[in-house]
Amino acid sequence: MKILKYTVEDKNNWNEFVKNSKNTHFFFLRDYMEYHSDRFEDFSLMIFDETEKLIAILPANIKEDILYSHQGLTFGGFLVDDKMKTETMLEIFESLKKFIKEQNIEKIVYKCIPYIYHIKPSEEDRYTLFRNDAKLIRRDVTSTIDLTEQVRYSKGRKWTINKAKKELVETFESDDYETFWELLTGVLE
């Protein structure tokens, strides 16, 4: 097993892997991640098996001697291909422990990807964290809306939606992550 630090030359391979992983999310596409390049020192990792096949990636940044599941993202953790098995994830963590020691990294802060984003639900990483005596330092709440079901809005929410319609507010899909991020951070402040 081989672990390599992500470089700009890896962008296409990285993005292709993200699109095909079983626990994917657009957060992990490089254009989205690099929005934070001025705030975080990227230390994303690519993990290859013995046949040189990319089997996992870890969006990450480094600060001092700590490797973080990327701090510029709401969540992170390993993205894996659809053939990932628990035994392989255990091997990845063993390789990762050796790798971080060689890099003089003292600790990893790991944020799991919420299961709702898994195309093929699995939690090899969580099990591996347990097997490695990882310490839980934070637990976040995950809430989802099933868009195939009719949403039942409260009166206040209906009023807000009708007001937005009267103001001709538009909603549409876009790949413009920078503008999305500006809107999102404005709303969350």
Where are these regions (language model features)?
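Short, charge-rich binding segments
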Residues: E87, E91-I92, K98-Q103, N132-L136, ...
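Short, internal active-site loops enriched in acidic
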Residues: I113-H118, Q150
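Non-transmembrane alpha-helical segments in soluble domains
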Residues: N15-V18, K97, W181, T185
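Acidic-and-aromatic substrate-binding clefts and catalytic sites of carbohydrate-active enzymes
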Residues: T86-E87, I116-K120
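Conserved GNAT acetyl-CoA-binding A-motif
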Residues: Q103-Y115
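Conserved donor-binding loop and adjoining core beta-sheet/short helix segment
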Residues: E16, M33-I100
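Acyltransferase donor/substrate-recognition loop-hinge adjacent to the catalytic core
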Residues: M1-K11, S122-E189
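Short, basic/aromatic recognition patches
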Residues: K22-S37
